[in-house]
Amino acid sequence: MRFWRIYYRLGQFGKEMVHNKGGKMLNRQVYVSDNEFIICPIADEDRDNYVELHRQINGEHTLFLNEHCKDMMWKQVLEGEDKVFSVFEINGDYCGSLELQNPDSDTPEIGIDLFENKRNKGIAPKVVKLLAKRCYKDRKVDYFLIRRTEFISQAIYLDFPTKKC
């Protein structure tokens, strides 16, 4: 496993999101947003999208579809030590999730998973940077570790700036 050091400074935060999804209005606390994306702490209303995301990544054998442990897995996402965020386009379309592992360390790790139809569109570097800037504003860190888990992800992270922005 390889890690890249990525350095960031300040970000935006503190808005509330209201959007129409499937004819239903949702009010969500926004962790950070810009003119393209909205990042919110994951919530119960994200469960179906999150499960589908993991089905796309892991196939039908994902633990989120396993009758014996799906509720336990979801509880871990909501209440675990890692912070999980849902990523939306500004129009409210769900893109995927971001995970901040070891959030209290000086070197937190950021992971990202996107729906198949949202991959290879330049979303990952933008939302990872957006999340990192906001996290840095909350608490100064030495650097963020970006985990590369798939060959496809390599292109996403190799294009990342490795200097201070």
Q: Over which residues does each language-model region extend?
A:
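Acyl-donor (CoA/ACP) binding surface of acyl/acetyltransferases
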Residues: 7-14, 18, 23-49, 53, ...
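Amphipathic alpha-helical interaction segments
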Residues: 12-16, 58, 72, 82, ...
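Conserved GNAT-fold acetyl-CoA-binding loop/helix
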Residues: 55-76
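Short amphipathic alpha-helical patches
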Residues: 73-78, 155-159
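A short helix-loop-beta-strand connector motif used in the catalytic cores of GNAT acetyltransferases and
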Residues: 75-87, 96
